[in-house]
Amino acid sequence: PFSYDKRRPLALRLGAARTQGGVVRQPLSFDAGHGSKAGFWTHPDGSGPWPVVLFSPGSDGTARSQLPDADRLAARGIASLTLDPPARLTTCHAQADLRTYVAYVVGRRRALDVLGKLPDADTHRVAAVGFSFGAAVTAALAGVDHRLRGAVIQSGRAHLSAPLGAYCRSAAYRRAFGAVDPVKYISRAAGTTFLFQNGRADPISPQADVDALVRAAKGPKEQRWYDAPHELDAQARDDSDAWLARLLA
């Protein structure tokens, strides 16, 4: 379901860049395949090429949510692309929400295409970070698009359909959304190394379903638990930064 027309123009537009504290931030927009997508291209001051991390936030996140992560990575010599998710991810209308989810993943595939047009982006050293809802999207992305060297799956689980079905109070919704559960796609990832990060005090991600996602990943992988809630903590962020720096060195 995550295929797309690679010939469709990206219509990339770059705004004015601003530099602060050795970090350059530039707004951008492009055709994500199902409408325009806005976000930020963040990179170290100076010349590249830089490895790149593609971010996907949680269900209530925006292109700004993971800018603190992008700033920390810039200090390590890594560029980042942070992007808005689609609007209204969960309406409790199963077919509409499935279309939105597919558009989210396709938009991230188009974002990987955009990297080839961004100045000083090293398209051979690319990783992705997904948090919560974005973790499911990132797991699917790794399974269907094999341009990722690695991916950090934060507060993810095997079956996104479970919390969504509970939220919508609908077994039918859960069955329908189960068609795109991340556990069905992460096993198809090729050449991708994974870091799974979860909090022991996270009520949304039970350990059994987290472990099921980790088991499904076939390549090199590492799983870390934290004494933290769904949002994780500073230690998890430090670990992710260091892991990405090693992976993309």
Task: Identify the meaning behind each predicted range.
Residues A189-A190, L195-N198:
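Short beta-strand/loop motif that positions the catalytic acidic residue
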